[in-house]
Amino acid sequence: METLDYRFDGTTHAHFPTNAVLVGVLASGNLEILLEPAALDGAMTVRIITAAQGFGSVWQAVITDFARRHPLRDVRISINDAGATPAVVSLRLDQAVETLLGGGTP
């Protein structure tokens, strides 16, 4: 298992209608993403736990792209990965934000 941690400055306030938002299913070739409110001085943190070791540069590119498109403030993102492709990761991250903005229902 490999753990990767990232931190980005956020500009967009996220209103959580529930305590957290969870999307995806941790299964072969997929991942689950949890968004939680957190006092992070306006930052967004991302922690990835993955079984696929050695893909740090790919993860960094995908997460940096997401942070540019969705610069959330005071949000902790936890990703549990079971070998998802970059396209699936981006899709699930966008789904998580859409769920958050849509009131918490996937």
UniProtKB/Swiss-Prot annotation:
Residues in the signal sequence: none
PTM annotation (O-(phosphoribosyl dephospho-coenzyme A)serine): residues: 28
GO molecular function: acyl carrier activity
Post-translational modification: Covalently binds the prosthetic group of malonate decarboxylase.
Keyword check for Repressor: no
Phosphoprotein listed as a keyword: yes
Main location class: cytoplasm
Pfam families per record: ACP (PF06857)
Keywords: Cytoplasm, Phosphoprotein
InterPro entries: Mal_deCO2ase/Cit_lyase_ACP (IPR023439), Malonate_deCO2ase_dsu (IPR009662)
GO cellular component, one term: cytoplasm
Cystine pairings recorded for this chain: none
Domain of life: Bacteria
Compartment(s): Cytoplasm
HAMAP family: Malonate_deCO2ase_dsu
Role summary: Subunit of malonate decarboxylase, it is an acyl carrier protein to which acetyl and malonyl thioester residues are bound via a 2'-(5''-phosphoribosyl)-3'-dephospho-CoA prosthetic group and turn over during the catalytic mechanism.
Family: Belongs to the MdcC family.
Name of the protein in question: Malonate decarboxylase acyl carrier protein
Gene: mdcC
